[in-house]
Structures are given as C-alpha cells and as structure tokens.
C-alpha cells in the first residue's frame, strides 16, 4: 500500500514552496483505475452514494497499448494535509472494498 500521508505532505509542501495560495479552496482530484469496467462502475456508484462528486468514467490507453478504465472524484478542499487525508483514507478504503485501484490525488497551483 502506498504511503499516502507522505505523498500528500510532499504535494502540499511543493505547492506551498512554489507560492500557491494557502488561503483558498482547491479542486482536489482523486483518481481511480481498474481494468474491469463493472468494478470501476461499482466504485463510482459507491462514492456517489457517499456524497462525492464523481466524474464520468473514461477509457485510457497505457504506454504498452493496454486499455484501462478510470474516473475522478473532485472535492473542494483546503490545501491542508490532514483535511485531504480524511478523503484519501475514505477513498482508498473504498477502492479496496470495490477491488479497484486508488491512484492518488492531485490539484493545480493557485496564486
């Protein structure tokens, strides 16, 4: 299992060091992937039922030509590791339960 806290701390500190505004809300995108579309769909539905804003699934092509399904969950959040980790912990557990992969999160620099 990934060390999501350490990864989250690195992302947040990098954004803040680059001058991103710590006082505004950010759109945090949580990424999910799976080769099995029905499992991915089940995870998306479960996240929606928990109140998350679920984006439409998309089929992606990997570098080796293989196909994989993905979707994102978008959450407005402070740029705060503890706040973000609340969602990471819930969503990573949901991914395990639904047998899909939680592929981390990201956001964009904001001035």
From Swiss-Prot:
The keyword Zinc does not apply. It comes from the Bacteria. HAMAP family: RraB (MF_01888). Globally modulates RNA abundance by binding to RNase E (Rne) and regulating its endonucleolytic activity. Can modulate Rne action in a substrate-dependent manner by altering the composition of the degradosome. This is Regulator of ribonuclease activity B. It is found in: Cytoplasm. One of its GO terms (cellular component) is cytoplasm. Keywords: Cytoplasm. The keyword Cytoplasm applies. InterPro entries: RraB, RraB-like_sf, RraB_dom. It holds the Pfam family RraB. GO terms for molecular function: endoribonuclease inhibitor activity; enzyme binding. SUPFAM superfamilies: Hypothetical protein VC0424 (SSF89946).
């Amino acid at each position: 299992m990934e060390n999501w806290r350490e990864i989250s701390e690195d992302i947040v500190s990098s954004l803040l060091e680059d001058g991103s505004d710590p006082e505004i809300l950010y759109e945090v995108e949580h990424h999910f992937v799976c080769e099995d579309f029905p499992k991915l769909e089940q995870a998306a539905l479960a996240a929606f039922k928990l109140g998350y804003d679920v984006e439409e699934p998309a089929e992606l092509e990997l570098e080796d030509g293989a196909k994989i399904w993905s979707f994102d969950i978008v959450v407005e959040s402070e740029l705060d590791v503890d706040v973000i980790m609340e969602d990471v912990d819930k969503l990573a557990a949901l991914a395990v339960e639904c047998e899909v992969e939680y592929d981390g999160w990201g956001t964009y620099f904001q001035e």
